[in-house]
C-alpha cells in the first residue's frame, strides 16, 4: 500500500479502481485493520485485478472530523473504494476482509 498525502492521492484516484484508507498511527482500530488491509491487497493482487491501494494519514490530511472537508473522514479508519474518481463504497472502522474483497470484485463483473 502506497502512503500518500491527500493532495497527491486525489489526483491518482481519478482513473481506475482505487482503495483509499484514511487512518492514523495512534488509532487502535487502524492498527487492528492494517493486517486485514494487507490481506485484501494481496488477495486482489492474486486475482490479477488492477486496483491501486493508498494510505492517507487522517491527521496530516486535515480532513479528520471536519464536516466541511472534501472527503468525509468522520471516523477512522475510513475506507473508500473509488472507480474513475467516483466513490462507490465507504466503510468505517473495522470491516471483515471478505466484504472488502467482494466490494472490489463487484466492480469487475
Swiss-Prot record:
It comes from the Bacteria. Residues 2-109 form the Thioredoxin domain. Disulfide bonds join 27-30. CDD domains: TRX_family. InterPro entries: Thioredoxin-like_sf (IPR036249), Thioredoxin_domain (IPR013766). PROSITE patterns: THIOREDOXIN_2. Keywords: Disulfide bond, Electron transport, Redox-active center, Transport. The keyword Electron transport applies. Belongs to the thioredoxin family. Participates in various redox reactions through the reversible oxidation of its active center dithiol to a disulfide and catalyzes dithiol-disulfide exchange reactions. This is Thioredoxin. It comes from Mycoplasmopsis pulmonis (strain UAB CTIP) (Mycoplasma pulmonis). The lineage of its organism: Bacteria, Bacillati, Mycoplasmatota, Mycoplasmoidales, Metamycoplasmataceae. The gene is trxA.
Amino acid at each position: 500500500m502506497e502512503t500518500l498525502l491527500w493532495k497527491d492521492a486525489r489526483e491518482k484516484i481519478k482513473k481506475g479502481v482505487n482503495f483509499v484508507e484514511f487512518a492514523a498511527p495512534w488509532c487502535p482500530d487502524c492498527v487492528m485493520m492494517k493486517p486485514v488491509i494487507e490481506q485484501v491487497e494481496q488477495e486482489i493482487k492474486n486475482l490479477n485485478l488492477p486496483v491501486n491501494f493508498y494510505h492517507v494519514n487522517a491527521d496530516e490530511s486535515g480532513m479528520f472530523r471536519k464536516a466541511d472537508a472534501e472527503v468525509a473522514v468522520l471516523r477512522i479508519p475510513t475506507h473508500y473504494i473509488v472507480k474513475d474518481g467516483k466513490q462507490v463504497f465507504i466503510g468505517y472502522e473495522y470491516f471483515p476482509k471478505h466484504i472488502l474483497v467482494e466490494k472490489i470484485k463487484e466492480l469487475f463483473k
